[in-house]
UniProtKB/Swiss-Prot annotation:
Essential cell division protein that stabilizes the FtsZ protofilaments by cross-linking them and that serves as a cytoplasmic membrane anchor for the Z ring. Also required for the recruitment to the septal ring of downstream cell division proteins. It holds the Pfam family ZipA_C. One of its GO terms (cellular component) is cell division site. This is Cell division protein ZipA. The gene is zipA.
Length: 346
């Protein structure tokens, strides 16, 4: 056992020494050799020594093979004397000769597009010039009535168009005056009689509908085992352009802003049938009721269409069901029945 340990120790030492030797040898091998140790160093050295001893070859201009010439030494205070220009007899002769004045030549501008010569059309008529003039006279006289008639037609058409425009403008002003309501404030003492007349006209228009003869009802009911929460109902009512008003219920007016006549309304299906907007978060109910009286203001069919679409939209928003006045599922037969009732009370 001890011999084995000794052998392993010796082998390990030999391996360590071999690794160290190989490392030093690798480092020495990777280091760049200096110029003196390189084999080309002696070559350059011999070339330099040979060049110093041998004379340099210079060309006719005094430059060697490398383009280097002899060193020139100049004095610091040497004045630079300008050289006189070389005499040139040709330049002297040119200076003596004076240029002759040249008259300006006017160049006519050429047109961009050359016009082709117009070919005169031959006159094949056998009549004399006097006959031609006599023939042209009646022709011109015959054309004058035609032009006069044409101008008269244009004048009549212009008058007709202006008259039609005046009539259309007058009709538009009358329609605009009928549609627009008087909003100007009174500036005279007769303001109270005017307001009384206006209120009487409105009351008379309200009395024209008479007593309601029929009521169209739609129920929006929660599904079985569920309730409709007031926190969900209130934003839905406002989105559908309902406004809280008379009888503590919500009404749909002619104007989306809540102005004008009431088209239809929404009430609570549970007695007493009212809403409290301040406590809608604590409010819950089984359902709500849409109702519209007949006759109504405006187009009854259009008003019912708006009410039906509002009920369907509310049912989709709060996951409820639309029922008819008898609390039966809304269907095509019920729709036809409601349309018949609307036509009967129109």
């Amino acid at each position: 056992m001890e011999d084995l340990q000794l052998v392993l120790f010796v082998l390990g030492a030999i391996a360590i020494v071999a690794v160290l030797v190989h490392g030093f040898w690798s480092i020495r091998r990777q280091q760049p050799k200096s110029l003196k140790d390189s084999p080309m160093g002696n070559f350059y050295k011999k070339q330099a020594e040979r060049g110093e001893g041998a004379p340099k070859r210079v060309d006719a201009d005094g430059f060697d093979a490398d383009g280097i010439g002899a060193v020139r030494v100049r004095k610091a205070n040497e004045a630079h004397t300008p050289e006189a220009p070389a005499f040139n007899p040709y330049l002297k002769q040119e200076a003596k000769t004076q240029p002759q004045p040249v008259e300006p030549v006017q160049v006519e501008p050429k047109p961009l597009f050359e016009q082709e010569p117009s070919m005169a059309q031959p006159d094949f008529s056998l009549q004399s010039p006097t006959a031609k003039e006599q023939h042209r006279g009646p022709k011109a006289s015959r054309q004058e009535p035609v032009l006069q008639g044409h101008s008269a037609n244009l004048a009549q058409a212009h008058v007709g168009q202006s008259h039609a425009a005046m009539v259309a403008q007058k009709v538009a002003e009358e329609q605009r005056a009928q549609v627009q309501m008087p909003t100007q404030t009174a500036l005279f003492d007769d303001e109270e009689p005017y307001e009384e007349e206006q209120s009487q006209a409105v009351e008379q228009a309200d009395d024209d509908l008479g007593e309601p003869r029929d009521v169209l009802v739609l129920h929006v009911v929660a599904k079985e085992g569920q309730q409709l929460n007031g926190a969900e109902l209130l934003p839905c009512f406002l989105t559908l352009n309902f406004k809280y008003g008379d009888m503590n219920i919500f009404h749909r007016h002619v104007d989306n802003a809540g102005n004008g006549k009431v088209l239809f309304s929404i009430a609570n299906m549970v007695k007493p049938g009212v809403f409290d907007p301040d406590n809608m978060e604590q409010f819950s109910t089984q359902g709500v009721v849409f109702f519209m009286t007949l006759p109504c203001y405006g187009d009854a069919l259009m008003n019912f269409s708006i009410m039906l679409n509002s009920a369907r939209q509310l049912a989709d928003d709060i996951d409820a069901v639309v029922l008819d006045g008898q609390r039966q599922p809304w269907g095509e037969f019920t729709k036809q029945d409601y349309l018949h009732r609307i036509r009967a009370n129109a």
